[in-house]
Amino acid sequence: GSVLMHDGVVEGGTGELNRILEEEQPDTYVGMPTALLSMLRMCGKGSIKRALVSGDACPKTVMKAIEEILQTRLWPHYGSREMGLGGAICCTAHEGMHMRENHCITEIIDENGNVLPDGKWGELVITTIGMEAQPLIRYRTGDWSRIIPGRCLCGSEIKRLDFVKRMDPLGSIREMDELLFEIPELVDYCVKIVDGKKEITALFTSDNGEERIRSVLEEKDIRSWNCRKVKWEDLALYPGKRVTRQ
């Protein structure tokens, strides 16, 4: 069976989540990567052995931390609603993500719309093949990546996408994830852009968490923050009231 926590909902907070994990003994997690890492850091690994992370980008530091806790590998993939979700997926070589070339044509362009050769970084452009309801023709995704040149170590010649990130002049949330989730004491954080400056609220679990977070933020010249230590049983999860069992 499975326990569906709709929209991440557990009414009683992390203490209730921990009770459900102990009672149900799930071996697989399906959901957002940062939510998984927060859960693992607050509740521990428990019975979970593997994970399918989706719905959000998975930064390298988050992926590394999850892999270390679960002692397994994650398989990065790329997609979006506009292109029909599935666009590229990692292979056993873990050297980039193979594009689904039977589904979409992939290009990398510069700021003027010129197509760049393999190996050059630029904006990812997608043309879908066979989509009738919403075909995309040279759709500018707003994502920054490159096509890795040469054949993959797995032997396939299918095009590979490198690490994908958002094109954001103020710095993307993914970059903040890379920066902050490397701190083992961090459970979660939120960031606001006010007058072009970042304001960060961070939740951590140990006495030296605030000092480590403060040091990282100061290195990046982020001067506005609020750090708060939390106990796992007191940490509230996403608002809502429904837990559906199937």
Task: Identify the role of each PLM range.
Residues M5-Q246:
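Active-site glycine/GP-rich loop and adjacent strand/helix microenvironment
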Residues G1-S2:
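Conserved short alpha-helical elements in the N-terminal third of ANL/AMP-binding
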